[in-house]
């Protein structure tokens, strides 16, 4: 596999161990406008308790060569159905709503024929039927289940978004029965109305047909004064009368102003005798918004059995009662047992019906239930602080969302613990719960409302927990809290011994293991810590994939007590508590031995070769670049964040060679370092080895590889008694361009252009290595941001020692002394070019002490040696 094809495979999601690559490659080029939709039509009316529809406008012209900013939905084989006229498809929105053409945040979809470069990047068989299609209806050509489409953002970039299949749904409100009322349309997550201008019977007939209330409708009008605050979506609707959905009619987007006569569109459908909806009431609740569902039928009140009772049924009940807010189903006589007959069983609503009478169900009085199974609902009004779980199979699981100022938003998982989960599930009416993996549920597109939430476990409501102010966070939606709650019973009990959390990892699936014992969080000593122990921890946290143990404070040293030592799991236990054989608090360890884990670990090596043709286009990619806050101003680097960082090691008879110098990978077989690294031990190739893919110097990892040295090339002008020409190349052992195996953790850096002036082209510069941290040499790879300085600083400070083949970099401020000591001799000084490729501009060479005031570090200027490097390496 060539390096170019390897990187393309990573872009298409073919290699499971690569996470976040798309954001690295494309964030600066394409940003989803989910957080700030483009400006567009004005909505003069809107509901105070619902989200205002996102503003949209037609997309700007497409870029000439658009590239997808993130991975498309995962490819799955699925046979597409041909046909030019859009009809209900199993791979689009469900039957009845196949004409949806906007994303769930309101952006209009592009026609499929307008984005051929995207389709050409995917397997042809999966996309063949969409090429050339002029429609822009939401589809799911990859068979992923949820339809999506491409859209254009305000900067002319192309992105993709999931669609809301309820968009365009209609209902009638305020009539004497279900066959008449004001027309309300569902768009962008909010119900709104239609201005009555040019509203006629053809338009009304389409509404009646869409609601399956007959094929003929009579146009009516309703005064806006009686509707309250509600958005107006359309005006001048112009249906022929034979359309199957109001979305297919010509119409104008409402642009504000005054609707003629201040009247909203309404209809009366033509059925002369329609079904009579049963009378419903809620009983046994603490307010009018909740209770046991009771129906009046055949002269008496009765209950509903909870067999197959879910939130879709609850939504219909709330709608029929005229109650807005969050609809939630309750089971097992949650609001007490009723009396009288059990009226209905096996109710299976889709959630779009106007009445329970329209839902599939048993015959009246036919059931196999007792009153212990009476169904209930709650229709919780939307007030600030209301919580819900969204995106799951039911109200018991999903993404945690909080309602605030008319909009649902998510909660960041920073510092999230099982105690927080207990409080959430308890407020939602469940006894137990656990944090779920975020990839089980789709990412949100709304705001992130809360961060750094900390509950004691005694709170009765989620908002009683300590937290940041509303909207203050440093997170992305990849860090949204997801939860699965359980109703109770031994099979769902989550109180499995002690609460467990993972701290200081790069994501919530990894980190230092901490347990909550005797009211205090503490760590676990790594004595005897193995993958079997890690598997139990990950299982307790809800992760099902492979688990890997990490030792020696791999994720940093914890604070507080060391609770547990000598854990002995077989790998089959349900919780950590089943593995503890030693008294709590008894140990002989320090925090430098804190245990850690990585859950859902997929560490397959991906082999690949570099070659001259592909190297220039794919070098300098940080495929595992993740959260920016962990990089800017940080010390510990991201694992795999600097994939070209390698170490030159001195071989020993014990096989545990000492780290001698840092170095930079330029290709599969060539490494760049400093000439002075060979001054003490000579240039015999048998004395050295090069380690690639390293992060923690004492913990072997799957991507790590130690390779012998075949050739050492020191610049011919270098003299050991001087610092000029301090540059060398090392050829690794192996066949041509097949020495180091490329992976997400092992990739080459880019070379600068000959005589390129980095101050003119580079920003965001870093030095990396296992160098001095102020206390000792680090076990984990360090990084430090460092500014490039004008050469006059070093010329004045170092006089004749500083030449034109050197760079000057460092921070001259008293409180920010960062220089080459925090890297390694021979290690890279990397800067980011526009377009997110990283270039090795300097090789760590020399300086006066570590962090000495007014003594910046000096680096060999790589751009001055590009012709020499290319002549030696043939790159």
Swiss-Prot record:
Compartments it resides in: Secreted
EC number: 3.4.21.-
Cysteine pairings via disulfide bonds: 93-165, 109-149, 138-163, 195-259, 208-269, 239-249, 305-369, 318-379, 349-359, 412-475, 425-485, 455-465, 525-589, 538-599, 569-579, 619-750, 661-677, 765-831, 794-808, 821-850
Chain spans, region Zymogen activation region: 619-630
Record-annotated site: Reactive bond homolog: 630-631
Main localisation: secreted
Positions of region (Disordered): 29-88
Signal peptide: 1-20
Keyword presence, Cell wall biogenesis/degradation: no
Domain Peptidase S1 intervals: 631-874
Database matches in InterPro entries: Kringle, Kringle-like, Kringle_CS, Kringle_sf, Peptidase_S1_PA, Peptidase_S1_PA_chymotrypsin, Peptidase_S1A, SRCR
Enzyme active site: 676, 726, 825
GO biological process: exocytosis; zymogen activation
Glycosylation sites (chain numbering): 26, 683
Broad EC category: hydrolase
Domain of life of the organism encoding this protein: Eukaryota
UniProt domain SRCR: residue ranges: 170-271, 280-381, 387-487, 500-601
Functional note: Plays a role in neuronal plasticity and the proteolytic action may subserve structural reorganizations associated with learning and memory operations.
Disease: Intellectual developmental disorder, autosomal recessive 1: A disorder characterized by significantly below average general intellectual functioning associated with impairments in adaptive behavior and manifested during the developmental period.
Stated name of the protein: Neurotrypsin
Organism in which the protein naturally occurs: Homo sapiens (Human)
Gene that this polypeptide is encoded by: PRSS12
